[in-house]
Structures are given as structure tokens and as C-alpha cells.
Amino acid sequence: MNFCRFSYIRIAIVLCLCSVAWQVQSRDYVKVVDGDSLEIGRRRIRLLGIDAPEYRQFCFDAQKQKYECGKESRAYLDKMLKKARYKVDCRTQKTDIYKRELAECFIGKTNLNLEMLKAGWAVVYRSDDEAYLRAEKKARKQQKGIWQGKFLRPEYYRRLNRR
């Protein structure tokens, strides 16, 4: 009887350790897809309430020079995650029609969604969150990121460039 109880305890411990190991691995593997999308393990995550330029999208700076704003936006998000050694906590609120998790993602207490807006590398998307709206307005006023010149809002760019 003691042997059976001991075996069940060992099995329970092994199962717990396996699940913890899987969580650590999936949190360690983070891929920045573009300025508003991540892959964490097998999870596809879209940053909720923001819309960043598409990876192949171009914008125009203050001197009317064309630049790769989609790549710049992605690089900015990647830089923030790299500083945090890709340790990110994404809090899923819902799932979209493409089966991506719509989430607010954090590095510690720093909200990545909000930081992308503050830096000017994203626009508010279908959100009435006051902090998000203020951050976008401030970035626009300070001509940060995509607000330094002219750009097509990402949702319009996608409509014009459907495959």
C-alpha cells in the first residue's frame, strides 16, 4: 500500500515538473512577427487595441523620403523584448477570426501595447482606451515614429494590398 501511494506521488511530481518545463520553454521562445504581433511557442498573439504598419509597408519621413516603417516598427518592439531577454507576459482577452489571441502584453509593469503607441510605431485600433488615445495623440504631436511624416493607416494598407 505504501509502495502504491509513493508511486502515485512520484507520478504526480513528474507530471507537475513536465508542465512547468513546458511553460518555461514556451515563454522563452518569443518571435516578433511585426509591430503588433508575436509568437510565443505555438501561441499567435496580436497586441490588442493597436495597429502597427505591416512588415513590408513603406512610409514617408519629414523630408518626404520613403522608408520601411513596417520593419522599423517591428525592430522597435523586438528591441524592447530583447532588453527584457524576451520575458513577456501576455494577458489574452479574446481570440480573433484568425485564431490569434488578442492580448495586452507586459514586460514587468510596462505595457508593450501602450509603449508602441507612445513611440509612434502604432496607431490606436478599435479601442476607446483613454491611455491609448492620449499616447497616440502625444506621439503625433511630437512627430514620433510614423507620425514624423506621411503614412497610410495599416488597416487601409491591408485593404489595398490583399493577395
Question: What is each stretch, according to the model?
Answer:
Residues 2-163:
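Small beta-barrel nucleic-acid-binding modules, primarily SNase/OB-fold domains
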